[in-house]
A protein has these predicted regions:
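Membrane topogenic/interface segments and analogous intrinsically disordered interaction regions
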Residues: 1-225
Length: 225
């Protein structure tokens, strides 16, 4: 319900968000966005089916809803588990609600400022001198939205690990002893969830997941947990 409500609020301004995201990573026409559709330089979005723009708007609205809904989901899970939690476990879970939102925003920012620029620079240089890329709205925007949503979820890894350890579900040693299994699992998830045949996006996703996993274990070891 929360995700749907936020999506409805964002949908009317989705076109502005689409243009902002698109030209954050791809070159705009020399004469500005209004030059799209004419013979101009720049990576204007290409629409190859009548529903492409509508679906792009829905994806933007859904991403906003997902980010806001993450802490709500954590809180709803807390309400479900609350009768069986000890007082200290309840404190941990309540603290996780705002932390989840912060981590989701950090994940989106990480994708926006670091991951997506690297991916699109790689794409632009990949075929330079061989072919001119026509960036389709659907496929290109799917990648942008997927990376932002995926990194919002990926950055929950430290939170989930810490909650599991603090609540006695697992231990740092158990996770550390099986790190290679987690690494391979992260790699498999990255290649399944990242629609990039060049392999650049899955590689960056997998490296980020492994790094977050190891940094969390390092922090727990440093704090003596």
């Amino acid at each position: 319900a929360v995700m749907g409500g936020v999506a409805l609020l964002v949908f009317p301004v989705a076109d502005s968000i689409i243009n902002f995201l698109w030209y954050s990573f791809l070159p705009a026409p020399d004469g500005g966005i209004s030059e799209c559709g004419t013979a101009s330089t720049g990576a204007c979005p290409r629409v190859y089916n009548p529903l492409a723009l509508l679906l792009a708007r829905l994806k933007v609205a859904s991403l906003a809803g997902l980010i806001v809904a993450l802490p709500v989901f954590v809180y709803q899970t807390y309400l479900f588990m609350r009768p069986g939690l000890y007082p200290n476990e309840r404190r941990y879970y309540l603290a996780a609600v705002p932390t989840s939102l912060v981590l989701a925003l950090v994940g989106v920012a990480f994708a926006y400022f670091l991951i997506l620029p690297v991916i699109f620079v790689y794409f632009l240089n990949y075929s330079e001198g061989v072919a001119e890329i026509a960036f389709a709205l659907t496929e290109t925007f799917d990648l942008i939205i997927l990376m932002m949503g995926l990194f919002a979820l990926i950055f929950q890894i430290p939170l989930f690990i810490m909650l599991a350890i603090m609540m006695g579900v697992t231990t740092r040693k158990w996770l550390a002893d099986r790190r290679l299994l987690f690494w391979f699992s992260f790699g498999g998830i990255a290649f399944l969830c990242s629609p990039d045949p060049t392999g650049m996006a899955p590689l960056l996703v997998a490296l980020t997941m492994i790094t977050l996993f190891e940094l969390t274990l390092g922090l727990l070891r440093w704090t003596g947990r």
